[in-house]
UniProtKB/Swiss-Prot annotation:
It comes from the Eukaryota. Component of the trimeric PUCH (precursor of 21U RNA 5'-end cleavage holoenzyme) complex, that acts as an endoribonuclease processing the 5'-end of precursor Piwi-interacting RNAs (piRNAs). The PUCH complex consists of tofu-1, tofu-2 and either slfl-3 or slfl-4, where tofu-2 exhibits endoribonuclease activity. PUCH-mediated processing strictly requires a 7-methyl-G cap (m7 G-cap) and an uracil at position three (U3). PUCH also exhibits a strict bias for piRNA precursors with an A or G at position 1. Its main location: membrane. It is found in: Membrane. Disruption phenotype: Exhibits no defects in piRNA processing. In a slfl-3 mutant background, almost complete loss of mature piRNAs and piRNA precursor accumulation. The chain crosses the membrane at residues 326-343. The keyword Coiled coil does not apply. Belongs to the Schlafen family. Keywords: Membrane, Transmembrane, Transmembrane helix. GO terms for biological process: primary piRNA processing. This is Schlafen-like protein 4. The keyword Membrane applies.
């Protein structure tokens, strides 16, 4: 269920600072996830880019990619088997296997920016990891959640949509800016334009001093694995190293680590599957194994004999061809024809 709110009727919300509703940000701007504000000078640049990109076509072909759907199902299976539908306040957050998980406490939420989301998502994509960013877990792995109104949740959704749609190269979402956002309220949630990334607000219950249940664990999910190398539009490239988000120095380092090393690991994996398989349990006195061993040995003896015969035939043919001089082949034909004529005209009548 997507939270809805009409911002035009909200006196507390400053529409001029609603940076989530403007075009693709190509200057690497980062805005606050709570207030949604960026500097006015950057906002003007964003508006200018919005006018330039009005004609960009909206494409969602990746949503029909069967392989991507299969990968999403794999993430869903991992997620649904380990994550509950809600959390008790101060309950322990258990380790999630198979999904790279980043944890932030509720105090960090107030100062959290879209740049942190972009860097973590970039690192997950480049490292070929499923990922979850969980906001609302303290240093003791206790789930506290974050107090969020309906407006706060909408702002966070908008921030994530802008961060994903406008800052990655190659683009994660190919969308015309004003089809995605605009002066009107939000038209599309991130889950509507890409199947690879979404956000959930999981209820945190059991807080006695709160009248309404407005406490949630924020979970941003990267649900698909990509073979591409991504960078943020500011030129920064990120990777996962020992569970942390690490910035790479340049594209050359990214190419070496993310492509060359991956290729080497793939080759090693293939070699392992060919030559390093664990042997099956061996029964020494089993007649079945003994009979099978004889058949295998017989087949192994027959194969070299066939190969020897084939190689002998090839060597004889090759030697005959080597004896023939290709340049004198015409003289051979001429001599053959002359012999036939002499035989037919001179020798054959005498024999009769």
């Amino acid at each position: 269920m997507i939270d809805k709110i009409v911002f035009e009727e909200d006196e507390e919300y400053d529409l001029t600072q609603d940076s989530f509703r403007y075009g693709r940000v190509t200057t690497g701007a980062s805005y606050n996830l709570v207030t949604g504000k960026i500097p006015e000078t950057v906002l003007e640049q964003v508006k200018a880019k919005d006018d330039e990109n009005d004609d960009v076509e909206f494409e969602m072909d990746h949503l029909e990619d069967k392989e991507a759907v299969q990968k999403t199902k794999t993430f869903d299976e991992l997620y649904e088997s380990q994550m509950p539908k809600y959390f008790e306040y101060q309950s322990n957050f258990s380790e999630v296997n198979g999904i790279w998980t980043l944890l932030f406490d509720q105090n960090h939420y107030e100062n959290m920016s879209t740049f942190e989301l972009q860097a973590a998502i970039c690192a997950a994509l480049n490292s070929k990891h499923y990922m979850m960013i969980c906001v609302g877990i303290d240093a003791f792995n206790a789930v506290t959640g974050v107090e969020m109104s309906a407006k706060d949740r909408v702002v966070f959704r908008m921030a994530l949509t802008r961060a994903v749609a406008g800052e990655f190269q190659p683009p994660l979402v190919k969308v015309a800016p004003k089809q995605l956002t605009g002066v009107s309220p939000m038209k599309r949630d991130i889950s509507e334009v890409t199947s690879s990334i979404d956000v959930l607000f999981i209820p945190v219950i059991g807080v006695t001093d709160e009248v309404e249940n407005n406490r949630f664990l924020i979970v941003v999910r990267v649900k698909e694995i990509s073979d591409k190398v991504y960078q943020i539009s500011s030129g920064r490239i990120y990777n996962e190293l020992e569970g942390r988000v690490v910035e790479m120095s340049d594209m050359n380092e990214a190419f070496h680590k993310l492509i060359v090393e991956q290729s080497i690991s793939d080759i090693q994996t293939r070699r392992g599957s060919m030559f390093m398989l664990e042997p099956e349990p061996f029964l020494e006195d089993s007649p079945v194994i003994f009979t099978g061993s004889k058949e295998i040995l017989r087949e192994n003896h027959e194969i070299p004999n066939i190969l020897k015969e084939n190689s002998t035939e090839r060597s004889l043919s090759q030697s005959l061809l080597n004896l023939l001089d290709i340049q004198n082949i015409g003289w051979i034909f001429f001599g053959t024809a002359l012999s036939c004529c002499i035989y037919n005209n001179a020798i054959k009548p005498l024999v009769k």
